[in-house]
């Protein structure tokens, strides 16, 4: 474990700015070696047509288990995230706001504020921990499928508002452009 090629984590998100650059480059090579199933890529590409020639603000607003899980960074509250979304949208005038959240109430509130400007993937959302129980057949597989699709779509936006999460970190890594983070 004392080898510099390992990163010991206490299960918090890793601050990639503190990783030795050589090690970080290896990490990026490993990420590039991952292959995403063709059906997931096709699903994301089909949805991505809504992004075509549009200025998109991506918002990844965690809820669910991140609010209660041990050692998870605590997410911003709704007032904080909506305030920054409004501020950035008023300044840059986006065509759409692409919201990724697993909380039913967050989606409902965003729809109330942004209406038809809001776009989102029709996927599982809950008012509880999304990992509690199995409300649909193949629930865990479908959560993974939807998460990867959302990650791919977030990687295609022009600007990204997010709290600390692995999904937003992977969207930044997966993005082929210099994704502007807010």
Predicted regions and their residues:
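Secretory-pathway luminal glycosyltransferase catalytic domains
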Residues: 1-94
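Donor-binding and catalytic core of enzymes assembling or modifying cell-surface/extracellular glycoconjugates
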Residues: 95-181
